[in-house]
Amino acid sequence: MTCAIAFALSWGMNAYAQDNVFFVPDPETARWSYLEMDGNGATTATIVYSVDSMTGDAVNGSAKVKFESAGKQSSEEAAANFIYYKFKDGEFMIDMNAFFEEDVLGEFIDAAAGAEGIEATEEEKKEAIEEIRKLIEVSGELRGIPRYPVIGALPDYEFVFKFSFVTMTVKGTERKISGKEKLTTPAGTFDCFIMEETVTTKAMMQKEVEKTVSWYAYGVGLVKENTYDKKGKLVSTTLLNSINW
């Protein structure tokens, strides 16, 4: 599973000042970038993240994060996208349910209409959102790293997304905190926890199994992530390239 990408989440300054025990950057300077590399170590993209909005705090809250991606050889303007996160008792994870909120679906509809050179009316958007929601069913959640990691096993998770007659299932198994390591990247040197898991994705007649090994640092978030195929071959690496403090 693609890394996930990012971990630019912000929270109230009071919570941050009292106890910076979160796997996210400082909300006042939350802008950072990752290098995406293939299995041979060649850079395929640079992705820049920044916090667009935040509600609640890093214990229990949510965040909308903007990311911009451009291929190494591309001279075109990077496309802007958003990903949604939630904090649950200090653990942050991708909030898949947020993608199906009315305002988010409205943004997708506007983007699709704009690509066709048309503009949807508010009534048309409302009708489209209602029809989409009738076809969607979401259950479970994609778990992240706990606020206070302890070396040992972590709970498994399962996320199921149904759209009409299509079902996609994502399972995280063999999850564990396997150790600690000081890791150096272009952004600096960080004391990290190492998290490992096997991610199995099923959609229609296809099944994909990947193992991820991820390094997380307090006050930063994801520092590095290696993804391996089911045979143990390295297929991609995500590496922290820069961060504003």
Predicted regions and their residues:
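Acidic, serine/threonine-rich low-complexity disordered tracts
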Residues: 18-83, 156-245
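Solvent-exposed helix/loop surface patches that form functional interfaces
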Residues: 25-27, 84-190
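Bacterial N-terminal signal peptides
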Residues: 2-11
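N-terminal leader/targeting signatures
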Residues: 3, 18-19, 88
